[in-house]
Amino acid sequence: MKAPLSWLCEYVSVEIPVEELASRLALTGTEVERVAQVGVPGDEANLEYFVVGKVLDRSKHPDADKLSVCIVDVGEESPRTIVCGAPNVRAGITVAVVLPGGIMPDGTVIKDARLRGVASAGMILSEAELGYAAKSPGIVELPDSWLAGDLVADYLPLSECVLEVEVTPNRPDCLSIRGLAREIAAITEVPFEEDISYPHPWGERRVDEDVSVEVWAPDLCPRYAARVIRGITVAESPTWLKARIAQAGMRPVNNAVDVTNYVLWALGQPLHAFDLQQVRGRKVIARRAEPGETLVTLDGETRTLTEDMLVIADAERASVVAGIMGGMDSEITDQTTDVLLEGANFSGPSIMRTSSALGVRSEASTRYEKGLDPELIPLALDMACQLMIELCGGTVSVGTIDVREPETPPRVVTLRPARVDHLLGTTLPVSEMESILARLGCNVRDCGDDFLVSVPSFRRDLEREVDLIEEVGRIHGVGNIPSTLPPQRSGRGGLSPEQRGTRLVEDLLVGAGLSQVITYSFGDEKWSDRLRLEPSDARRKAVRVANPLSGDQAFMRTMLLPGLLETAGKNVATREERIHIFEIGRTFHPSGGVLPDEKRRVGFLVAGAWEGDSWSKAGIVTDFFVAKGLTERLAEGLGVGLNFRPATEHFLHPGKSATVEDPSGRPIGWVGEIHPLVLQEYELRGLTAVAAELDAELLIGLRPETPMFEDLSTFPPVEQDLALVVDRDLPAAEVVAALRVAGGGLLESVQIFDLYEGNQVPPGKKSLALRLSFRSPDRTLSEAEVNDLRSQMLAAVASSVGATLRV
């Protein structure tokens, strides 16, 4: 925001150099990007060359049709002859003259000259030459009351120092001259007048006789106020107003529009002026746009609106995109005589969405989207009416139409001085804290040990005690807070059991040859279809992201597998033939509350060969048993026992997958070969890929807190092989589990080394060849002991799973 220093000085006395002011603003959180000198070079010696002149006579140049020879009184003993090319120069007008020796805004030095044979001792200035406009058709005409020879700088801001300020999003109150002046007053400890007024006369007609106002969308328009000014004359703005508008970075239009822009910059409240004659039905309605409704805005563009956009309409059509830009149909023209003046407060998020959707940003929308003070509207309307009467004439209809939500009482925050010193590391006097808050516009009431602070309506960012403490520290000055070293605290940090378990899982999987990856926690809504999940599968109920970065990241993941498959697909696309990856991350599930449930899971994926061919041996092909072996290796490293049973996951290959359970039978995940149709969806066709995904919290929770030591036996094992005939559909794990139970403590291990299905076993049966290893910790087992235990085990499995010994 551009803030002319002379304009700021109308609200606050700036008694320090502008460079120091810029530095102090920056140190308190309001960055001044640069201090620019605009207009005429501003030293006093140069300004003395710019004087008021009276054109006494004008005659046609003898040798140029477009030039005039003027006799101009500039307050000297004798008038000067000045050649001028402006079409509006004539005898009797008051003008601005630069005398020879004066330096123009562009650096040109004015000299005595001869123009087509006629001597010219100076130059009569236009608004463009003064820096008030980009271009102007003629010279500037000044009020006749100004005296010849007076300095123009005594009447107009010829030279201006402009602060270009970067205002933070939480401080919309500083997007105005008055708001920035209040901040300067607080920083420099000079008086600031909070209570100001702009009195003006009223007419005889009541405003409700001219127009009515309805608000159909109070959620988008909490307050809408209107006044009517009748009988105005639209004309060019006076030079002083053009100068102010131009120095603030805006373009002068006409007196009526320039008044609204002046108020916007002065107070920070956007206003909009309608041509009352163009308001159909003399009715103003703040409503949502109709779907597909169109409006031609002031820039000549036809805007197509949506039903979530707010418009200001009359009885027949939309006239304004609220808070963004007015429409061509109701704009102020040279023929306008009656003006409807709007002062409103609109929903910031709504204005931001509309501005983004339409691709339009304006000074008004910039302020609305940050959240404005609704109590500022009456003051802004008063100021605008006063200026309208002064510059445009007319009368103000009596009263204000003001439609608003119920007024909210001021926010009251308790502030503890002791807490201020504790957080800031200071020992500030209580009186200084009170003074700082009062200078910021707060009402401070001393309640003994605490303050009750009433926050002004223009500071919506002050919600909690810590916000007030920040303000105290900011205005006191961060540089004034003494530096202190943090206290030394002995002792070492440590890891929680969960962190230790996670680190161990990572180490085990890295040790197994896998690389850790981190994938996005977001995905699109089609990932569950690509995984062929059942319509009733709870994992389809993904949490939608409120503000997604893109359409393909609109849902929180409920599984790690999609991210692992996408990573594998990208690696295969770069001709990486062996992918061994794992991830430990969170999945997100609907909870019925504000936030979703989060679960930590560990998953891995192996695609391509598990081990490549070498000169000495053939490679190992990736299959289900690679994934199962990795899962068992992980469990063994954690000291956890796991069981496996057939799985029915549709994204896994049928017959080559398993549900993973803890010793109590509680499911903690799955392992298996990825279905070929799923691999096609992720550009992995032609590859074999296996994966597993486990509940990391449950898995780590099964880990014993204290590892149990088991002494190594010095006695030899006794091994025996046997073949059992069982039902073809019986999981081998059930046979192994039954043998383990029956074998007791002397059975050291059970390994399956062969599976046979053929003519040598009955139909519907299969043969499992198992190697049993027996060992005692305190003696050598005899053959009789082992045979006896083996017989007991055969009887047990025959009873529990229907197994018979194959002979």
Predicted regions and their residues:
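Phosphate-backbone binding interfaces of nucleic-acid-interacting proteins
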Residues: 1-205, 340, 359, 363, ...
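A carboxyl-terminal module marker
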Residues: 2, 439-442, 452, 519, ...
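Beta-rich nucleic-acid/ligand-interaction surfaces
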Residues: 40, 45-46, 201-203, 263-265, ...
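Extended, well-folded interaction surfaces typified by the phenylalanyl-tRNA synthetase beta subunit core
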Residues: 179, 413-579, 773-775, 781, ...
